[in-house]
């Protein structure tokens, strides 16, 4: 049995989509228990495997992260993180304030001993539909080569345990594929990655080929990773809008759109990274999953499923025994 703590109040569409996702999750997974934290006035579920706990406070999207975690002690996010810290829950999921959730992860759940800096990881789509693991996408704006090596080690475990990939191929995001390309960070990181024979490091990868499906894990610093992630999100939205405008521009195009409706829907599903769940803060003493702030019920459900798999696979213990112990 896996037990997850859920922030009912976090996100643009909370609590409605959270309640819908939680209801579906406990119906689909008979080995899942939920502790739901939020406002009792908004709670309307009744299930034997859902425990509700009232919280008098909520962390808003505009709240300053560290201050909010320290001052709003009875917020749904803080109480959720405390449940993971105490061992009462195996992991947690929230669509709330990203900075506050990362602060809760660091200051409440706690960092694995030996992990220098936790990394935020997402799974992004590829043209072949299998996706790739991408980190760090914003936990740390600055990074040293040693941090990128550790990100690769964390990403390697994540790809194996969560995505079910044996001996995942690991690449370093760079401005060229040649080993000598890049700045001092990428050059030194390349050397360290190449020297770690426990990793299946296959070299540099350029941003233009990220979605080709040639690698399983891509490592970069949080500043670069966050910009790449937002660029991919923005490009996908722009292409979708352009395609819709083109289809609606004439009767001929509308007919073509109707004929291709099923294929276009399949394409949209393939490129929808919410299918893979939320982003995960790796390197902590518990599983912390960040669902997108604008998540619908489907995306939040995927994030719950992702946290459940992490609990089943005991990914935190694996990271302690490998990444943590090797860096003590």
From Swiss-Prot:
* Its biological purpose: Catalyzes the reversible formation of acyl-phosphate (acyl-PO(4)) from acyl-[acyl-carrier-protein] (acyl-ACP). This enzyme utilizes acyl-ACP as fatty acyl donor, but not acyl-CoA.
Instruction: Please give the HAMAP family that the UniProt record associates with this protein.
Output: PlsX
Can you supply one Gene Ontology CC term for this chain's record? cytoplasm
Q: What is this protein called?
A: Phosphate acyltransferase
What organism is this sequence from? Staphylococcus aureus (strain MSSA476)
Q: Gene3D superfamilies recorded for this chain?
A: Isopropylmalate Dehydrogenase
Biological processes, Gene Ontology terms: fatty acid biosynthetic process; phospholipid biosynthetic process
Q: What's the family?
A: Belongs to the PlsX family.
Do you know which PANTHER family this protein is assigned to? FATTY ACID/PHOSPHOLIPID SYNTHESIS PROTEIN PLSX (PTHR30100), PHOSPHATE ACYLTRANSFERASE (PTHR30100:SF1)
Source organism superkingdom: Bacteria
Task: List the lineage, top down.
Answer: Bacteria, Bacillati, Bacillota, Bacilli, Bacillales
**What EC number(s) does this enzyme carry?**
2.3.1.274
Q: Which Pfam families match?
A: FA_synthesis
Q: What is its main location?
A: cytoplasm
**What reactions does this protein catalyze?**
a fatty acyl-[ACP] + phosphate = an acyl phosphate + holo-[ACP]
Q: Where in the cell is it found?
A: Cytoplasm
Its annotated pathway? Lipid metabolism; phospholipid metabolism
Enzyme class, broadest EC rank: transferase
Q: Does the keyword Lipid metabolism apply?
A: yes
């Amino acid at each position: 049995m896996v037990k997850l703590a859920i922030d009912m109040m976090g996100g643009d569409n909370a609590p409605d989509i959270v309640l819908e996702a939680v209801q579906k999750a406990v119906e689909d997974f008979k080995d899942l228990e939920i502790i739901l934290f939020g406002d009792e006035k908004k709670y309307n579920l009744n299930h034997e495997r859902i425990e509700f706990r009232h919280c008098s406070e909520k962390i808003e999207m505009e709240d300053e992260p560290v201050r909010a975690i320290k001052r709003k002690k009875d917020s749904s996010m803080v109480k959720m993180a405390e449940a993971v810290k105490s061992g009462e829950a195996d992991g947690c999921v929230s669509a709330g304030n990203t900075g506050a959730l990362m602060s809760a992860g660091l200051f409440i759940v706690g960092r694995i001993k030996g992990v220098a800096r936790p990394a935020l990881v997402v799974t992004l789509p590829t043209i072949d539909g299998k996706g790739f693991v991408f980190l760090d996408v914003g936990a740390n704006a600055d990074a040293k080569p040693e941090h990128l090596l550790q990100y690769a080690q964390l990403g390697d475990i994540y790809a194996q345990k969560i995505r079910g990939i044996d001996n995942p191929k690991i690449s370093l995001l760079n401005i060229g594929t040649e080993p000598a390309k890049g700045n001092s960070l990428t050059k030194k990181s390349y050397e360290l990655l190449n020297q770690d024979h426990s990793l299946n490091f296959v070299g540099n990868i350029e941003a233009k080929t990220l979605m080709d499906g040639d690698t399983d894990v891509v490592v970069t610093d949080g500043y670069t990773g966050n910009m790449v992630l937002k660029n991919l999100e923005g490009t996908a939205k722009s292409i979708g809008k352009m395609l819709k405008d083109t289809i609606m521009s004439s009767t001929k195009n509308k007919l073509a759109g109707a004929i291709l409706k099923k294929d276009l829907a399949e394409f949209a599903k393939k490129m929808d990274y919410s299918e893979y769940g939320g982003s995960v803060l790796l390197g902590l003493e518990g599983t912390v999953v960040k669902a997108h702030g604008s998540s619908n019920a489907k995306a939040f459900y995927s994030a719950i499923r992702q946290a459940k798999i992490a609990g089943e696979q005991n990914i935190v213990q694996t990271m302690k025994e490998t990444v943590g112990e090797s860096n003590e």
